[in-house]
Regions:
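Short alpha-helix in the alpha/beta-hydrolase fold that links the catalytic acid
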Residues: 94, 190-200
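Conserved alpha/beta-hydrolase
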Residues: 95-115
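Short beta-strand element of the alpha/beta-hydrolase
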Residues: 75-83
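Hydrophobic membrane-insertion alpha-helices, especially the h-region
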Residues: 19-36
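Short, small-residue-biased leader/transition segments that mark boundaries at the very start
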Residues: 1-8
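Short beta-strand/loop motif that positions the catalytic acidic residue
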Residues: 175, 181-183, 187
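Gly/Ala-rich beta-loop-alpha elbow adjacent to hydrolase catalytic centers
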Residues: 138-147
Length: 254
């Protein structure tokens, strides 16, 4: 019988250690990802209050959250994708303000709270409404990227709303869709260089709204976001400017 030489046995041990090391590293990366993904931004007081139906708006909380104007014919709808790791209830104040002006608004629940993992979720929303003749999609931060990817591939989407966001490619430029891009001047999260450069990727008639003193987190109501700057305007003011800009944009969709 031939016995393994010491050299081959050493080699086996080294390989074994390397594989074990890779295995441990993989587990640690996975663990880190799950810890990161489970630390979400949660809705605060204003958001929770906005989830209650009133005389103007019916709020329905299922997998998604829909805001339906009461007592009026609704023919335009806005689908909203959340920012990364932001729980969708956080966008209730904005959605409600828009719905009060007569538009259906649906905030879409995403896998692991990452819109990029559920880019096509808007399709199911659109399929579930018979009364909506005009659809617009929008998103906050990473949600805007996912929303623009969906809009790029869907002929029935007539407009795109970017909140502290921008598209990855220039596909929207020539598609004939309306676009509005809104951001806060004190945003500490968005990459301003990419935001400015994205103007080249958007249609020539895009509407741009810079909210003086607004930041990244005040498009929702989920507290302070890591890396963000303090806003120098109130949350209410930022929400009002955002909602009014979107309402004006929706009016012009036809």
């Amino acid at each position: 019988h031939s016995f393994p030489t010491r050299r081959s046995s050493d080699l086996f041990n080294i390989k074994n250690k390397i594989f074990k090391g890779i295995g441990i590293l993989f587990v640690l990366i996975l663990l880190g990802f799950f810890i990161w993904i489970n630390k979400t931004y949660e809705p605060q007081k204003l958001a929770k209050e906005a989830l209650v139906s009133n005389s103007k708006v019916e709020v329905t909380v299922n997998e998604n959250i829909s805001f339906t104007p009461k007592g009026r014919k609704v023919s335009k709808g806005l689908i909203l994708y959340p920012g990364a790791k932001v729980e969708i209830e956080s966008y209730a104040p904005l959605a409600r303000k828009i719905a009060e002006s007569g538009y259906e608004v649906v905030i879409v629940k995403m896998p692991l709270n990452l819109a990029i993992l559920g880019t096509n979720k808007a399709q199911k929303v659109m399929d579930s409404y018979n009364n909506i003749e005009h659809w617009v999609i929008g998103g906050h931060s990473l949600g805007g990227v996912a929303a623009s990817n969906f809009a790029r591939d869907n002929k029935l989407i007539e407009g795109v709303v970017f909140l502290a966001s921008y598209p990855m490619g220039d596909e929207l430029k020539e598609l004939g869709k309306k676009v509005i891009s809104i951001w806060g001047s004190k945003d500490g999260v968005v990459n301003f260089k990419s935001l400015v450069e994205s103007k080249q990727k958007l249609p020539d008639d895009t509407t741009y709204v810079e909210i003086e003193g607004g930041n990244h987190a005040q498009f929702g109501d989920y507290g302070k976001q890591k890396g963000d700057n303090d806003a120098i305007i109130s949350q209410e003011k930022q929400l009002n400017i955002t909602a009014n800009s979107i309402i004006k944009f929706l009016k012009n969709i036809s």
